[in-house]
Amino acid sequence: MNYLEIENLHMDYDNISIDFSATLEKGKTLVIVGHSGSGKSTILRMIAGLLPSGKNAKIHLDNKDITKLPPNKRDIGMVFQSPCLFEHLKIIDNATFALDCKGISKKQRHEIGKDWLKRFGLDSMEERLPHTLSGGEAQRVSLVRTLIAEPKVVLFDEPFSALDAPLRKKLTADLSTWQKELGFTAILVTHDIEEAKKLGDKIIVMKAGKMAWEGLPEEFEEELL
């Protein structure tokens, strides 16, 4: 049974016309691959409500029409390529920012945040500022900041592409573990073929804004790009 249904997303920009539809079961991962400029990141932003999705678009999540809801009401989280942490806030406050927006008290936020940071191996960094972190540490804080709100769907826009290969491999493995533990449904944009095959339950290839191929990871070959 489909948990997430995306129909007729459409946008015209930069001499490209983007069209996209997809379905996904609960707890599964859809991976979107394609060359730069094929519309992958734009699609994620349309799903998240950060960009208009077109007049005929429909997005249903858990049997609820979320097409016209604002981003903060969609129950969708997003992790970007750059961590985009607030430089003036300590890690504990960066990690719990979504809880602050929900009006949860500072004491309760920090109690929840400490548990999450420990889960992600960041418990010794609560009082540090973002500029003192490595790239991998900062991206893990970004993951915590998104997942702590317990969204039903998480969108990942090449979250590990700026990291070195060993760290990227480790965080890819960690992401699979976290998804099983937390139970979220995911859409991942990546250029990494092995990452796509390892994490995806379904893969879609985008070319110049159009869906060029859709299938299972074991059927996917690099020549399809």
Feature annotation, model-predicted:
Residues 129-133, 137-139:
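Conserved ABC ATPase signature
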Residues 154-157:
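Catalytic Walker B motif of ABC-type/P-loop ATPase nucleotide-binding domains
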Residues 65-80, 101, 106, 110:
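ABC ATPase NBD coupling module
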Residues 183-189:
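Conserved H-loop
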Residues 148-152:
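A short, proline-enriched helix->beta-strand linker immediately N-terminal to the Walker B motif
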Residues 65, 107-125, 176-177:
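Conserved ABC ATPase "signature" region
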